[in-house]
Each structure stands twice: as C-alpha cells, then as structure tokens.
Amino acid sequence: MKIANLVFIDEIINNPGMATSPDGPNRLLGPDGGLPEALPPWPSRDNLRVRAVRAVVTAPEGLPLVVVRVDTSEPGLYGLGCATFTQRYAAVAAAVDEHVGPLVVGRHPADIEDITRLIHYSSYWRNGPVLNNALSGVDQALWDIAGKRAGLPVYELLGGRSRSAVEVYSHAAGATIPETLDRAEELIAAGYRHIRLQVGGPGTGTYGAPATRGGYPRSPNPDGWDVQYYLAHTPELFAAARERLGAEVSLMHDVHSRLTPKQAIVLARALEPYRLSFLEDVIAPEHYDRLPEVRAASPVPIAVGEQIGSVPDAVRLIRDGGVDLLRLHTSAVGGLTPTRKLAALAELLGVRTAFHSPGDISPVGVAANLAVDVSTPAFGYQESHTYNDATHEVFPGTPVVRDGYLWPSPEPGFGVDLDEKAASRFPPVKFRFDRWAAGVR
C-alpha cells in the first residue's frame, strides 16, 4: 500500500532542509504545507515501520471471522488482530482496507497508544461496532507484533500472570429440559465446572435463535416470543438442573436482552433458590440506564456488556453499579488497549470480567481475551467455544480447553497464526440470522 506524501523522521534527519511546522522540528509538513498522511511524530530508535494493513475474512465454521494482518518493514515480522463483527463483516473489512490501514502505514508499530487514538479520533464520528472492530484488528495486531519483537507472550507485557490458566464456561442447550441436561452432563464429564443452560420455547430455538415454525402449537403465538411462558418455565429448568446435576456445578443463564427491567427482576428473584453464578443480558442495551436498579433488586449477579460498542458505555456500566460481571465483546470496544484499561477500572470498583467469546470470535480474539484474563486480578469467568478441525487448520495455535481451563500460549505474541491458503477455502457467507430475516418477510 503506497501512501502519498509519506515522510519519515529519518528522512528529515538526512535532509535538514525539509520544512517543519511551527509546533517544532518533529511536526513535519508535507510538500504542500499540510501534514503528511502517515507521520511518525517523534524520532524512533530504529527504522521499523508498518508497511501494510489488510483484512482477511474466512468462515471455517460458517460464521464470518474478520482478522487484520499488519506487516512491517522487517521481513517475517507481522501481527494478527481480531476484528470480527459477524453480522456486518464486509463493512468492517472495508473500514480496515479503505480507512484505517492508510492511517497506520508508515508508523512505528510500537506506538500502540498513539496509533489507536489516531484511528479513534480521526473519523470525527466515533465508536460503534464497525469502526471499533476495525480499530481492534489493528490494535491487537500491534500488540502481537510487540510480543514477537520482545520474544514474550502478550500477557507478560501486561504485567505477567495473576493465574496459570483461566476457568471457562460452556453452553448446554436443548429443545427440552432433559435434552439440555443431557448436554450439561456431557460437559461435566469433560471437565467443565461452569455451564450456561438454555432451553427452547416459543420464539426461541435451543439457544435463543428464532424457533422452528410451529414448534409450540398450543402457544397463543406459536412462532413468536412468549414472555409469560419464558418467565414461568425458566425456573423449572434450573430446578431440574439442581436436582439432576447437584449443588456443586456453577450454573448461568442468558436472557438475550428480551426482558423489561421489571420482568428481569421477577426472573432474578424466581431463580434465587438455584444459586446461579450470573444472569446474562437481562435487558436491552437501549435500557442500560435502568441496570443499577435491576442489579440492586436482583439476588443473582448480573453480567452484561457484549452489546456495548464504546468505552464510555462500558465505563458507565462499571462506575454506576449496573453490573457484577463485565461481559465485553472486546473487539467491539476497540481491542486490547481499551480492554486492559476497563479491566483495571473493574478491579478498582469490585467488578469482575466474563468476556464474550462464542464461535463468532476468531481464535486470535480468544488469545487476546486470554492475555487479559490471566493478567488481571479482576478475572471472573471466560466464555469458551470448541472450534472445529477446519478452524484449527486456518488458525494454527488456536487455544484449546483442557479439563475446563484455557491455558495461555508461551509463544511470543498471541501464539496464534493464520494460514491464508486454508482460509481461502472457507469464503464468508451471509449470516444465518440475515437469511432467516429475509425468509420471513
């Protein structure tokens, strides 16, 4: 990628007659008197530069994953970052290739803080899942490069470990309660101690997705959401779970943002006897200003955050008492740099982390989550996903759950690579919810 009017600090040193701005000798002017498009704003101790930034989209499990590759002027030195917004993957890829990349080419890859602030503020209208995912891809890739240059895993750059591995939770879901609990027993046998339970009902499939048409013919609205059915039958799931699975296993539940604040309180109180570790996404993000009152009235810990698309919104959740656990989709807030700051704020205010990490996050994103998980004292839980063989082929070094834990890679950087030849065999397709929505119109 060629950047017009690109001027480096070392060029100025070798050409003292080149113009500088009134702000000082390190604020260079381009030939037309304006600032160059990509400008190292201070002398660097070496000539390493970002030489290319591009998005790679692949779907080895059918879900489009967006990964950003940042190449440097040192042969073989590159970094990878997760920029996955599955539902709008093409918009993120375009933002990376057309807008974000040109801001970064020519910069020294060590200047992560300044580069990410430049990307964030330069668009004028800031935040949102598209631009923040594009930013995240670059941010995480620069951290990956930093680890590789230092010969250290990224978590050692964040202060080192607070734990050797992180406990994860997985999902047990079914069309019926017995089916859900069968799956839960399989997970327990595999070593999981934390399990999120979901069961089908009107308006939902086994996981909260749109239901199979006609699946609940006795419901007044057989193919649509029935909140009364949900409020009545969800406690039955957890009563059966405690009876069958016992008291030791940790249980969670995801509401998928479907309730009003009052309904969320009703559900939380109904679930109190079953000692859930957390209740997730109890209300829609449009109503997050009501979360403090929900949390204050709930006997169950509240976990929210995966639909947050800005750092200020995440700060408000932590600061204002809206959450017990912060469920960030870390790429949607801009990557590792803001995530580590939010984890530090959470630590100071008594909130724990429980980062979003299902199959619509790339293995690179999992490794980035893991770097924060093992280093922050605020860690609570980590969501997990078991990737298929194709994903492991596309992403060598994909983290693997062993006996209910994720273990960080000792390799420099994040320890995850990208086989682009393998990735090309799995082109992206339209997200399944988009296909479903098109089919019901």
Locate each region found by the language model:
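Shared catalytic-loop signature of beta/alpha-barrel
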Residues: E98, D114, R269, R275-F278, ...
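Short beta-strand elements
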Residues: V66-E74, G397-V401
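Metal- or metallocofactor-binding catalytic centers and their adjacent structured scaffolds
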Residues: L29, A38, S73, L77-A150
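Proline-centered loop/turn at the N-terminus of a beta-strand
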Residues: P153, E167, S250, P301, ...
